[in-house]
C-alpha cells in the first residue's frame, strides 16, 4: 500500500514513510508490525521532542501521534508541527475521560 504524493497524482514506487510518535513501546511495536506488514516504511519516536526533531530531519508522508506524551503534550506537538508542515497526522490516544477528549 502506498500513499499518493502531495505534489503529484502519480503513485510512488517507494513505500510511504510513516512516523509513529508514542511513548508506549507496545503500541509502537504493534503499529510498526501492522504497517510494515502492509508495505509501509515505519520510524518510531518515544516522545514529542524526538518526534519534532525526526520530522524536521526527514519529513514523513504521515504521522501517527499520541496525545499523552511524557515530555510535550501531543496537542502541543500538533500545534508546533502545523506551524511548518501540512503532513497528514492521525491522532491515536487512550484518553477516555470526558474532560480529556478533543472536540
Write out the residue ranges for each language-model feature:
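Non-catalytic signal-transmission and effector/linker regions of two-component phosphorelay proteins
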Residues: 1-19
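The feature encodes the CheY-like receiver
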Residues: 28, 70, 97
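Charged docking surfaces used in two-component/phosphorelay signaling
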Residues: 29-37
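Short hydrophobic/Thr-rich beta-strand motif most characteristic of the beta2 strand and flanking loop
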Residues: 39-46, 54
Amino acid at each position: 500500500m502506498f500513499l499518493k504524493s502531495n505534489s503529484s497524482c502519480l503513485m510512488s514506487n517507494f513505500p510511504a514513510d510513516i512516523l509513529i510518535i508514542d511513548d508506549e513501546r507496545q503500541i509502537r511495536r504493534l503499529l510498526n508490525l501492522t504497517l510494515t506488514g502492509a508495505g509501509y516504511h515505519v520510524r518510531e519516536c518515544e516522545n514529542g521532542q524526538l518526534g519534532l526533531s525526526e520530522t524536521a530531519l526527514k519529513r514523513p508522508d504521515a504521522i501517527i501521534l499520541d496525545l499523552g506524551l511524557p515530555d510535550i503534550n501531543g496537542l502541543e506537538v500538533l500545534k508546533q508541527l502545523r506551524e511548518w508542515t501540512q503532513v497528514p497526522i492521525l491522532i491515536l490516544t487512550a484518553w477516555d475521560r470526558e474532560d480529556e477528549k478533543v472536540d
